[in-house]
């Protein structure tokens, strides 16, 4: 596909991904990575998504800051940062098709757990945050999809919509900023990546603003359904792409 076609598709994808991120507090990478890797390699797509994700989560974090509970989630953020460099190593050395299947499989597995109503109240959150954060960081570094483990954990703990969204974007902002040095060191932030990131930026901004506005009017039950639908569709698309079916 030529550059112009990639940009046109990218504008549509980034707008929709921005809407989802603004609405739910997550989903930017879950929506954009599976589709964009059909047209660009993961080694180009994932750094582009990272640069956009940093901007949008910071904006959402400012809007949702009053619901953030740093005392609760700081162990999660530290564990995520520790896992992230290992994920970056996987991104550099794994084949594109392998990464796509890995991305999709992780998403689908976690979504099925949510659909099955998997729930087990965990009293010692700080201890549980260590493995959850590390796995999330590993996935974030390799696929920019570190959300599913944390989303499942927060859902399991019964957080309401506003707290769920605020703590999630706070975690993502921290992890995304920590990922930048590893990507630079790995040679993943190239001139081509920056070019695409700049060209697609307006669509992401418009989508993010739209999503933030929708977040104030969408009811809790509809919010949860949207989350599950996004997860399952994105996961299946990524697997299909990895096997050459998409």
Which residue stretches match the model-derived regions?
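Interfacial loop-to-transmembrane junctions
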Residues: 209-232
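Residues within membrane-spanning alpha-helices of integral membrane proteins
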Residues: 11, 50, 103-107, 111, ...
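Transmembrane helix exit motif
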Residues: 57-65, 100-127, 212-213, 233-246
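Small-residue-enriched transmembrane helix starts and helix-helix packing motifs
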Residues: 1-20, 124-138
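Hydrophobic alpha-helical transmembrane segments in multi-pass integral membrane proteins
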Residues: 91, 96, 100, 140-145, ...
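Small-residue-rich hydrophobic segments that form or flank transmembrane alpha-helices
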Residues: 7-74, 147-205
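Small-residue-mediated transmembrane helix hinge/kink sites in multi-pass secondary transporters
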Residues: 34, 88-92, 152, 212
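Membrane helix-loop-helix hairpins that form the core translocation module of multi-pass transporters
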Residues: 43-116
């Amino acid at each position: 596909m030529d550059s112009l076609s990639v940009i046109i598709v990218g504008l549509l994808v980034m707008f929709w991904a921005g809407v989802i991120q603004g609405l739910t507090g997550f989903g930017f990478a879950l929506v954009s990575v599976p589709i964009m890797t059909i047209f660009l390699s993961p080694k180009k797509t994932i750094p582009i998504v990272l640069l956009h994700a940093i901007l949008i989560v910071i904006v959402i974090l400012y809007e949702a800051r009053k619901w953030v509970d740093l005392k609760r989630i700081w162990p999660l953020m530290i564990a995520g940062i520790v896992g992230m460099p290992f994920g970056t190593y996987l991104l550099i050395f794994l084949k594109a098709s392998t990464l796509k299947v890995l991305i999709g499989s992780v998403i689908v597995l976690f979504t099925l757990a949510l659909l099955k109503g998997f729930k087990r109240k965990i009293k010692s959150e700080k201890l549980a945050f260590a493995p959850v954060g590390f796995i999330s960081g590993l996935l974030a570094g390799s696929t920019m999809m570190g959300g599913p483990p944390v989303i499942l954990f927060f859902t399991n703990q019964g957080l309401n919509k506003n707290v769920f969204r605020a703590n999630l974007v706070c975690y993502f902002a921290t992890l995304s900023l920590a990922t930048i040095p590893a990507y630079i060191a790995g040679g993943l932030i190239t001139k081509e990546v920056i070019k695409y990131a700049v060209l697609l930026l307006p669509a992401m901004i418009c989508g993010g603003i739209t999503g933030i506005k929708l977040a104030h009017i969408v009811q809790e039950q509809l919010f949860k359904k949207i989350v599950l639908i996004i997860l399952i569709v994105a996961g299946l698309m990524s697997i299909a792409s990895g096997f050459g079916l998409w």
